[in-house]
Amino acid sequence: MQNEIDIGSPINSLYIIEDKLIVACGGGPGLKNKLILYQLQLGYIGEKLVENILEETPKFIEGIPSKKIFGICCDNHIIFYSISQDWKSFKKIYTLDINPKDTVLISFKIYQNTLAVGDFEGELKLFNITFGNNEIVSINEIGFFHNAHWRGINKIEFMSKNKLKFLITASGDGNCKIFDITDSTKPITFITNFSFRQLYSEPANYCMNDLIFIPGKNIAYTIQSSKNDKKAKSFLTKWDLNNVNLVTPLETINISNLPCSSLDLNENNKYLGITDVQGKIFFVDLNGLRVCNEEQIGENQLKCCKFYKNYLVTGSIGYKLRIDKLKSRFNLAILKNLFYVLAILGICYYIYLKKNNLINLEI
């Protein structure tokens, strides 16, 4: 058992179901396109349970844990698989082709019976899924929003609030948008736009690379990076989505002076894991929104990350699959302040002892 392994191809996406890890990898001449299933253990990448060689490069994975079904997007279609009860095989159960044929898909999300799909051109589509017994019976398009963004849709999240259903999208155009999809018989309705430009006036082209939404709290976190190579910066922002008509930025911090590519939330919603393009991981404490630890674990871009309990699993374009323990530590300033407080208390206690003749030092 190891905490880092080389799987021989660039890692594009990760998906965790129960204590298993699915890895989508491939791309590049002479490199194999693969779907691999691993057993996860605390601190280690365990046994390889399944390895499928694919004809096309799997770019992104999303799944439905309760049904042991997941999908991968490959250019203009999504291929759905079911996982056998003994975790020993994948079975292809449905292929959804997206028109037009030159469409390049980069994101999708499944919530209950609804599938939302985003492509490289900023188009947004909505589908209804009919499930059978660990299978998909049919998928039908129920909505479409032309030019939802003017660049690719990197991430999609669902939000339910007061019996209403919304989509949140994050795009390479630097914007996040909210759409009302409550009534599937009516067109998708644009509600509002929120952007890092509300907070930061530096003339730079910022891209919304990733988005995490916390249901119940109606809080979202976005990671946005500058595309200006000379002034490359990445920021993490916390947003209040309780009023979908007027999204409010709550906090923002500078994470890195390099572009950051992905983020994920740990299971108790207390920490974020963030990866950058030069092999570094950041752990962010959401209580106060501060980086509590950062660690250089490689030299290549860490393209994706997923939390498994209090461990962060990362995949790099340099073929490395790795698992690292969440490390939180006191900020140095806090330690200094604590030292000063203890020193003052010690002096006060010494004065008290001297004043009451409880101590007698002779030199």
Language-model regions: role of each:
Residues M1-E4, K20-E51, D75-W87:
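Beta-propeller domains
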Residues L21-V23, F70, L115, L167, ...:
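Hydrophobic beta-strand positions that form the internal "hydrophobic ladder"
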Residues G8-I16, E55-G63, P100-I110, A148-M159, ...:
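Canonical WD40 repeat/beta-propeller blade segments in eukaryotic WD-repeat proteins
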Residues K303-A333, L358:
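Blade-level signature of beta-propeller repeat domains, shared across WD40, Kelch, NHL, RCC1
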Residues M1-D6, Y44-I53, W87-V104, N134-G152, ...:
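Inter-blade linker and blade-boundary elements of WD-repeat/beta-propeller domains
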